Amino acid sequence: MTADTTRRAAAGRPGRSVKTAAAIATVTASLLLLSACGDQTQAAQARREAAKNRNPHAPLFSKLPKDVQDKAMLQVGSDITYKPVEFRSNGQVEGIDPDLAAAIGKELGIKLNFNNATFDTLMGGLKSQRYDIAMSAMTDTKDRQQGIDSTTGKKIGEGVDFVDYLNVGVSLYTQKGKTQGIDGWETMCGKKLAVQRGTVSHDLAKEKSSSCESSGQQPISIEAFDNDSEAQTRLRTGGVDAVSSDYPVAAYAVKVSGGGNDFQMVGGAPLKAAPYGIAVPKGQEKLRDAIKAAVELVIKNHAYDGVLAKWNVKDAGVKEVKINGGS
């Protein structure tokens, strides 16, 4: 190899480096431009969506915080697996909570958009601002208000405020026309009962069974299942005498299973009644109060009654909307 050849090779490297650098700069600029265009497109879509959802003439629009007015939407965290409170049907979110949320949104002049998540992640989602509120058959408790883990007793967050909108207890139901003499928990001694494992119904059944034994009667034979559907199947096939579930779940099963011919409610008013609440992060008092006013208006104009009648849960209705009414 000659000196000239070596020099030409050496001399060529800077040229290629310059070209490479120029190419990288061009690509980088293009990516930045695309990113900027993408951001602008998303922003434009958000503005169009807000314009579509926003109704500044709605009765309570002016009560909302400015940022909520601007985006005209609240992101709702919800575990959409709990028929009939919230569930999916043909790709759509349906149930008591979505219907009430639509009525609430109408009074606020915005849209409430449901996002599916497991129940145990909802409080964390509020804390991280992934969701603006949570509406998911969530019982209003002091622990949740104060941000305390009920299992460990440790404080894990600032907590939430609840706008209470339903009052839900535990119900009993049997095969239709085959009550086996059951007309309430007092007549369950010596009977077979199916429940969902780890629920309030399960705890109440064990409590009532102990009472049976204390009074010299036979205990309740309790069969615990992973979900209410399995418990209902056990009742339908005659394996147990009754099922206990949260009132909305029980009422829905009585209404729809077998066209309303499979089950019947027994025992009168639900026991262990406690409020379901819409969870709003602490420090969002203006949003909380606007939602409370919207629920009150939905009750006043009877849209509330219509939703509860549709889902056969009229007994769960409230007359007064409370903030943090749970214990």
Language-model regions, residue ranges each:
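C-terminal motif of bacterial Sec signal peptides marking the signal peptidase cleavage site
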Residues: L32-A36
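Extracytoplasmic small-molecule ligand-binding "clamshell" domains
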Residues: A46-M138
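Bacterial signal peptide processing site
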Residues: G38-T41
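Periplasmic-binding protein-like
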Residues: D164-T174, V200-A205, K255-W311, V313-S327
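Acidic, polar ligand-binding/catalytic clefts
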Residues: K111-E186
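Bilobed "Venus flytrap"/periplasmic-binding protein-like clamshell domains
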Residues: K83, V93-K106, N167-N227, A242, ...
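A ligand-binding cleft/hinge motif common to bilobed small-molecule-binding domains
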Residues: M138-K155, K206-E207, T237, D241-K272
